Structures are given as C-alpha cells and as structure tokens.
Amino acid sequence: MKGFFQIFSVSFFAVLLWGCSNGGDVELGSLSEITFNAKHLSRGVLNQTTIDNGEGRVYVCGVQNNSTKIFNNVAITRDAATGKWFPSTKRNWVEGSNYSFHAYAYSTNSGLTIDSSKDGLEISVQQPTSYNEDAMIDYLLSHSFKVADGAMKPIVQLYLEHAMSLVEIYVVRGNMFDARLIKMTFENIYTQGSMKCTSQATANSGNRNVWEVSPSGDNDVVYTFEPTTSAVIGDKRENTEARMMIMCLPQQLTANTQLTIEYEVNEKVTPESPDNFVLHKEVFQLYNYQPVNYQSGHRIVYTATVDSGVNLEGVVAAWKDVDYIEGTVLPEID
C-alpha cells in the first residue's frame, strides 16, 4: 500500500466546546454566595479528572461593575459532594451589579511564568527540551462568563480551553486488519516563547480564545513519543481505534519543521502467517501548506480509507502562522 500523506492545512486551532448542565446541583452555603463550575475538554496533561482531584491549580478572576476586582487570581477548589467549586475568598452576589469572570489552570509551574497583573491572559513558557509526557506544561484559559445582574445568582460556568498545541494521530479500524501506532517524531520546533490572549471568547458564544504566540530561541528541538505499549487496534472487537499525541508550544513553521509517524499494519494475512505486521513510515513536511475549505469556528474533518482496510486520519492542531486555519492531513491513495 502507498502511505504518502498530503498536507492540506496545518494551522488548526483545535478547540471543541463541551456542554455542562446545572441540573441536579445541590446548594451549599449561602444562596447568595458566588460559586463556580469548571469544565474542559478531556485531553492533554490536565483532564477533567485531574482538575477535579486538585492535581492542577485553578485560579479565578472576577470584576464587579466593570471596575471593582472581587476575585484577584483566587484559587478555587471543588466540593466532591456537590461538584461545585468554591473560592478561598467568599463573595456574595449584589443585586443590580454586573459581573465578568474567567479562570486559568496549569499542570506545573516549572518553566511557566504567569503575569498575574494581566489575570493570566499573558504567559511565558519554557517546555522541556526533550519530550516527557508527564513534565509538559499544560495551560488552560476559560471563556469569559458575564452576568448582567447579580440578582440572577447563577453558577458561574468556567469553560477552560487548552492554550498549548496538540499533534494527534488516529488509526481507525477499517475491515479485518489490525494496526499499531509505534512512534511520533516532531523535528526542529520551538520550546520557548511568550503567549498573549488577544481575544477572549465569551461563554456560550461559540467563539474561542485567540492567542498571539511569540516563540524565542532556536527551533532545533526534536520531540519523540513512543508509547510504552504500542497503541493497538483490532486486538478486541470493541477496540476500534488508537491514537498518539504530542503537546508542545504553538509553532511558527519553518522549512525544517517535520513530523514523522511510524505505524504497522497487519497485511496479507494467511492461515500460515496470521500476524504479518508491515512497518510504514510517513513524513509530513509542514511548511508552505495551502489551506482548503476553511470555515471559521468549525472543525473540518477529512477521512480516507487505505487499501489495507485501515482508515488513517492525522490532525495537526493549533499552529500559529498567519492565522488559525483549520484542516487535517490525509493519506494519498493510488
């Protein structure tokens, strides 16, 4: 089979909105007390479980009547009984006042500088120079949640988005063939830079946070990710997909930036040779791509079926070049 991949677009701000509901919430404390709910996409170093368990730090900022800061980078923690989040500094709703809130969270403070005077909207990042899944900085910023009148007393919904870039490769089982994801290598990338949120989305608007990224240093770092156990599909009937992911600083792509994927497909199986895994190595040259079928605010998905019966789809996510453009990479089929 031929496995050459084409790049249609690699500047994809990969942020999905997720829903949450207040149904069944149990009130705790004063009915006038300002409480929160923190939700975000379960991917990256910080997922919903680690956030709920307090493994990542979550801080809230809040302004009353467009001028009075009532929450100044205040830590919030989750109450397990109700699922609601409470700040270390208590505040009550005031009827007739308007409010604006947002929050940020991070997985580690080593290599991360947060400008608290900018309420977490500006950061500096130094990611590890060799890829370590457990040591990567994961930074999240919520949408802005606005309340027109404190008399409404809502639970403040904090929808957190990842600010870092994600490179994800999926293999989806096609017909009768098994596949294994072996290794990802991302070459000549930046690991250091500053990031500034230039447009913060408002909750429930359908928009997303937009970051201005200024990398610094040299783009000569190589990230390699090899699963401890090869990601396998097809070993069980219900096991129909596998994926690998690298998280890093949003990149400004150069002619030297290259992504390499290694995977195996069980091909030409016979009764005498039930396991005939063939290694494939695909190289993505990520420079001078041309975006196609761009539509702001929507994830565009392309799929293709390789003749082995395995559907391959690669997603290169959240690159900062001229603008955030959505797209994917695809195998070329002959």
Region locations from a protein language model:
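Sec-type signal peptide cleavage vicinity
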Residues: K2-Q6, L17-D334
